[in-house]
Amino acid sequence: MRRTPAAERLSELGFPPRRGRQEPPFPLGVTRGWGGWPIEKRREGPRPVPFSERSPEDGREQPAHGSGILWRVRTRLSLCRDPEPPPPPPPLCLLRVSLLCALRAGGRGSRWGEDGAGLLLLPPAGASGSLKAERSSSTPYAGRMLENSGCKALKEGVLEKRSDGLLQLWKKKCCILTEEGLLLIPPKQLQQQQQQQQPGQGTAEPSQPSGPTVASLEPPVKLKELHFSNMKTVDCVERKGKYMYFTVVMTEGKEIDFRCPQDQGWNAEITLQMVQYKNRQAILAVKSTRQKQQHLVQQQPPQTQQIQPQPQPQIQPQPQPQIQPQPQPQPQPQPQPQPQPQPQQLHSYPHPHPHPYSHPHQHPHPHPHPHPHPHPHPYQLQHAHQPLHSQPQGHRLLRSTSNSA
């Protein structure tokens, strides 16, 4: 059985027969591109010439080239000259492409993803004017806020602070530098305040006395203040690319990383204001100590006048107790050794026993240590107790011993 070819089967199904290779028109009949410029299909080989541009000589030579030129001419969708360059694309296309590039860079998690997006997506001319208006509208609120607190804004701008989280992302903060510290405000809160301020300002412009009502409508701001009294140093200043990185070290030991464009020089301004604040505090401390010393000197003269009369009455009674102990030594000689001669008189009498050296002083004055020499014993006791009357008593003792002998 002979197999029918594919062309016959297609013709049986109702499809038209294929007449050589034919190219369809450029995609789905689209004749103009995104920016409005015409699409020109280019093929390899000699460029076909449209009928309107052909000369009679070209027409005579057409049969020599063959019938392929006809369908080539049919595929050309635009009748434009090649030497003319295509018109430049509008900026809208570039903006869309830049948006896609920025989203891709940020999605990959690159370090500079957010910066690239900020650089590529430039706002149009009208938007820049609106941003300036928003910035100018934000400054009065910051000024009023600082005036209420009694501070003066020395510098305002945007600083990027490294977050304390695990990812350590750079977050933009609206910073206000004052004479006493650095104020950090989240940008979202400022945007909300600006949005609430703008309708309030529109109603407040015709009538000036409604100013306090607008101030009362402003929501409270969540501020973070880095006071110079708690600030130790500004350290680790590094320049990488277009940014300057620096670290603020607090007295508690906490370190806060910041970065800013090199042209702004936030690190120099912060260090200068911190040094000036510390100098002012030192001068105030010296003045306060001097004032305290002056007050003490002024209070000292009345105190000396009160102290002087106090020692005078103390000096007068001092000689009186000195005079009283003078009669005391007079009664001291009163305890004279009057009872002592009584035992001596007892010793003066002769003992009835023939032995005169047998312990004559046991009863009145017992001696713990025995004397080796018995003869001088009575004389030593007599000299110790009563040296003035020892001689006559001694003679009596000698006489008594002689008589007994």
UniProtKB/Swiss-Prot annotation:
Protein name: Pleckstrin homology-like domain family A member 1
The species this protein was found in: Mus musculus (Mouse)
Bias type Polar residues, positions: 204-213
Domain of life: Eukaryota
Function as written in the Swiss-Prot or TrEMBL entry: Seems to be involved in regulation of apoptosis. May be involved in detachment-mediated programmed cell death. May mediate apoptosis during neuronal development. May be involved in regulation of anti-apoptotic effects of IGF1. Required for TCR-induced apoptosis and expression of TNFRSF6/FAS in a T-cell hybridoma cell line. May be involved in translational regulation.
Entry comment describing in which tissues the protein is expressed: Widely expressed with very high levels in adult liver and high levels in adult lung. According to PubMed:10428057 expressed at low levels in liver. Expressed at increased levels in atherosclerotic lesions observed in hyperhomocysteinema.
Residues of the PH domain: 153-277
Region (Disordered): 1-67, 189-217, 293-405
Main location: cytoplasm
Record keyword Repeat present: yes
Sequence ranges of Low complexity compositional bias: 189-202, 294-309, 378-389
Keywords: Apoptosis, Cytoplasm, Cytoplasmic vesicle, Nucleus, Repeat
